[in-house]
């Protein structure tokens, strides 16, 4: 399901409805006005990435918000698929997970995730994610609003 404006595109791969609602609220609060494509399992996220990759008219994918514990295909599979595509291999990824295991963080780092975000349990904590998304996308949003500018490399914490 894709919603929003066509100026930028975010893939949200999240199977938890409550967490998805918090992510949406955080994006809204931080005025992130992008098209959102939501996949509630890893297989659907991978199918979406493949569909984008083979369609030369598909929009640019600006960001992926990725839960690592997805049904059918896990977040690591989604991340590896994304990194293997020519067109979207450099797309910024923010990994969202409830896991605090060193292995989960190493997997994210190994696959060049820009940020590793430990999922909190409250809206106020999710607001940090909204601010992070806004900072990653600010060059894209600025380009869409002004018609100029270049994307910068966003520094990350991992």
Locate predicted features.
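Conserved acidic segment of CheY-like receiver
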Residues: 7-18, 23-27
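The feature encodes the CheY-like receiver
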Residues: 66, 71, 101
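Residue-level signal for the "D+5" position in two-component response regulator receiver
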Residues: 38, 70-73, 110
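Short, glycine/charged-rich "phosphate-handling" switch motifs in NTP-dependent
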Residues: 114
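C-terminal output helix
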Residues: 121-133
């Amino acid at each position: 399901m894709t919603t929003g404006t066509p100026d930028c595109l975010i893939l949200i791969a999240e199977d938890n409805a409550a967490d998805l609602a918090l992510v949406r609220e955080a994006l809204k609060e931080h005025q992130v006005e992008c098209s959102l494509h939501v996949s509630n399992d890893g297989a659907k996220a991978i199918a979406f990435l493949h569909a984008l990759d083979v369609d030369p008219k598909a929009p640019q994918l600006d960001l992926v918000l990725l839960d690592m514990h997805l049904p059918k295909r896990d977040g690591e599979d989604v991340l590896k698929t994304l990194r293997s595509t020519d067109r979207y291999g450099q797309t910024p990824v923010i990994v969202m997970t409830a896991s605090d295991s060193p292995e989960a963080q190493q997997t994210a780092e190994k696959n060049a995730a820009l940020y590793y975000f430990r999922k909190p349990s409250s809206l106020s904590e999710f607001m940090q994610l909204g601010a992070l998304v806004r900072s990653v996308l600010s060059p894209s949003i600025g380009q869409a609003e002004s018609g100029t500018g270049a994307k910068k490399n966003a520094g990350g914490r991992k």
